[in-house]
Amino acid sequence: MPVLEFGAAALAAGPRLPAAGQLDVWMVRRAPLETAAELLDLTELSEAERRRTASFVRPTDGVTYASAHVALRRLLGAYLGLAPQDVPFVREPCPGCAEPHGRPAVAHPDPPLHFSLAHSHGMAVVALSRTVVGADVERLPRAETVEVCTPALHPGEQAELAALDDAGERRATFGRLWTRKEAYLKALGTGLSRDPGHDYLGADPHRRPAGWTLLDLPSGPRHNAAVAVRGGAPEQVTVRWVPPVALYAGQTVDLDAAGTVGVPVHRGAEGTTNGVSDWGA
């Protein structure tokens, strides 16, 4: 993908879908608060997205939400060869009741393009793949968050946390496993309506759910991020950082020139369906 074009230029460039076995992850930092109102291009958002942006009590949360959704629309538009405002979103059937309020999706792409969006405290993650994918990003948890939420975890995860004497290490470990858990539940389409204690997403990749690959992502010192991909480990995983200028009106940005990080994937014996990155458990 030499140049990622936005808007009308994306139409001329045509679709640029990921290859089979390829996982593309885009990390987005929110636009600077002092320039967001003037430069962030909200015209590409739906009316519902603009209302949601305006509904946040804290301006930083509204800018994070808007930055994430502008990035999502521009990225999907570039991959599909569409203007950002023309990307057709739908909801898949809920796994529990079959009503149309499940995982967000793009309507009828051929070949399929799956995506997942997550955002938290100034950072967003957009994951795109030809197979089902879920993504999550969270700010590093506070000690009280770990204490309150640990009883809801899988017994194996609770045991791993209990074995850690250092409070800082316990927070870091909880943060990594929780982002894996949310990424996996988003990929399932259930979110936290599924009991978070039902599935093991701890440090041992061989105990994680069969048929899925879980990857920790490099996300800086203040966040944890992870993706869950249906099936075996992707052949190629690439993480790119989107500069804030890419969210502004009238921009064409060569994102291959932005920070690009290849994510190493551990591949086990034939049939192994869990992968882990070199950034640890």
Stretch-by-stretch model annotation:
Residues M1-A281:
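Core catalytic alpha/beta fold that binds nucleotide/phospho-ligands
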